[in-house]
Design a protein with these regions (language model features):
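Active-site/acyl-donor-binding loops of N-acyltransferases
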Residues: 28-53, 139-149, 153-200
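Amide-forming acyltransferase catalytic core, primarily the GNAT-like/NAT-type
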Residues: 31-148, 152-154
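Conserved GNAT acetyl-CoA-binding A-motif
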Residues: 5-20, 160-172
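Functionally constrained cores in energy, signaling, and assembly domains
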Residues: 5-8, 67-68, 116-122, 169, ...
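Cytosolic ligand/metal-binding cores
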Residues: 23
Length: 200
């Protein structure tokens, strides 16, 4: 309550959080506004993609794709990529400037991962976060339309043989040859509450 009073006195229009449990915050007028799409993929998914795409997939993996971990000096490029291609996708979003992506790089490195950049013919076509602290986790992949295969080829290059991959924040279920998307789910993640209505 004190935190909300402080935010009201600062004329903050709203506040948000990732709740430990909805029941704790619902009585204080917090409501979910974002559901994160999640899926867990195993060797069968990556093998099926290779089989399904065959020569096209091999061409992507060996010739077209160049991917690497982002460095601090890439943060501005990442912010510009997101602003130019994805800023219209969200109603409410954290300010994704160079400082945001520098912080993301450090956070992912603390979990034995990083921010991955995927290029096609020197053009940035995809960015995503990954962590390897407890198995491979892919977070919030953002790729240009038609570049999904480059993203998956990059992920395939990061994982160990037979390693399961958890993916968080996909825009849509992956193109799966056998149409097996039962592991694809949406989990409520972010709650929001209006604090100072006049500031909205």
């Amino acid at each position: 309550i004190h935190a909300l009073q402080d935010q009201y006195s600062q004329k903050m229009p709203f506040t948000f959080l990732m709740p430990a449990a909805e029941a704790i915050y619902h009585p204080y007028d917090f409501r979910f506004v974002y559901e994160q799409k999640q899926i867990e993929l195993d060797e069968a998914f990556f093998s099926a993609r290779k089989e399904y795409k065959n020569d096209e997939y091999r061409n992507i993996s060996q010739e077209r794709i160049v991917d690497r971990d982002a460095r601090f000096m890439d943060a501005g490029k990442m912010a510009a990529f997101v602003e130019e291609n994805f800023s219209d996708c969200w109603n409410v979003v954290a300010l994704r400037n160079a400082q945001y992506y520098q912080t993301q790089i450090l956070e992912q490195q603390s979990e034995f991962g990083g921010m991955r950049l995927v290029f096609e013919e020197e053009k940035l076509v995809c960015i995503y976060a990954y962590a390897k602290e407890e198995g491979l986790e892919i977070r919030e992949p953002l790729y240009l339309e038609g570049k999904e295969d480059l993203f998956w080829a990059s992920v395939d290059g990061l994982r160990e043989p037979e390693e399961k991959v958890s993916v968080y924040g996909l825009k849509e279920a992956p193109d799966w040859p056998d149409d097996e998307t039962s592991a694809y789910k949406e989990k409520p993640l972010i709650m929001i509450r209006i604090v100072h209505l006049q500031e909205l």
